[in-house]
Swiss-Prot record:
Pathway: Lipid metabolism; phospholipid metabolism
Keywords from the named record: Cell inner membrane, Cell membrane, Lipid biosynthesis, Lipid metabolism, Membrane, Phospholipid biosynthesis, Phospholipid metabolism, Transferase, Transmembrane, Transmembrane helix
Keyword Isomerase set for record: no
InterPro entries linked to this entry: G3P_acylTferase_PlsY
Pfam family, one: G3P_acyltransf
Transmembrane stretches, start-end: 1-21, 51-71, 78-98, 112-132, 155-175
Reaction equation(s) it catalyzes: an acyl phosphate + sn-glycerol 3-phosphate = a 1-acyl-sn-glycero-3-phosphate + phosphate
Protein name: Glycerol-3-phosphate acyltransferase
Organism superkingdom: Bacteria
EC code(s) of this entry: 2.3.1.275
Length: 192
């Protein structure tokens, strides 16, 4: 059952809502505009705030639902919950449907954390909003949110495995944002 849940997590994470919705509703491929990323930030740039918000919500849900299922089926198996959540985020970053060229995993990670460490997800979301409101730089908000999730998870997670997952997700976020980090250091990162 564990393998099936992990596979389900990966396949759910692989659903490229940003690509599908911009193509179906706007007739454009989000990968050819803005940053070329498939996530909510670039969808907002390419197709508008409303569609960006829908993609944000759907990307979070595709992280949350497989984890909810794993928690319901195997309530005393935090390692399985972590594996399923990690698989969902990796599915978003490396989707089988897009030749492993996906997004940065921020919204999907938020969905995973909403289930496993809701306090960390809430704190991260609040920090993102605050940092973005001041800086108008989405990547800076995402990185600050990821760091906040790690700290909050260390203090509030019900299982040490969940705190470890938060740290691992932040490490993945650093990897997927490596170009953004360089641009932040050079002060050339895009603002909204």
């Amino acid at each position: 059952m564990t393998s099936a849940l992990v596979l389900l997590g990966y396949l759910a994470g692989s659903i490229p809502f940003g690509v599908l919705l911009t193509r179906w509703l706007r007739g454009v491929d989000v990968r050819t505009g803005g940053s070329g990323n498939i996530g909510a930030t670039n969808v907002t740039r390419v197709a508008g705030k409303k569609l960006g918000a829908v993609v944000l919500l759907l990307d979070a849900i595709k992280g949350a639902l497989p984890v909810v299922l794993a928690v319901r089926l195997l309530p005393d198996a935090p390692t399985v919950h972590v594996a399923v959540g990690l698989a969902a985020v990796l599915g978003h970053i490396y989707p089988v449907w897009l030749k492993l060229q996906g997004g940065k995993g921020v919204a999907t990670a938020l969905g995973v954390l909403l289930v496993l460490v809701p306090q960390a997800a809430l704190a991260a979301a609040l920090v993102y909003v605050a940092v973005f409101a001041v800086s108008r730089v989405s990547s800076l908000g995402s990185l600050a949110a990821g760091a906040t999730a790690v700290g909050t998870s260390a203090l509030t997670a019900r299982a040490v495995e969940y705190a470890g997952l938060s740290a691992l997700l932040f490490a993945l976020m650093l990897w997927t944002h490596r170009g953004n980090i360089l641009r932040l250091a050079r002060r050339t990162e895009r603002r909204f």
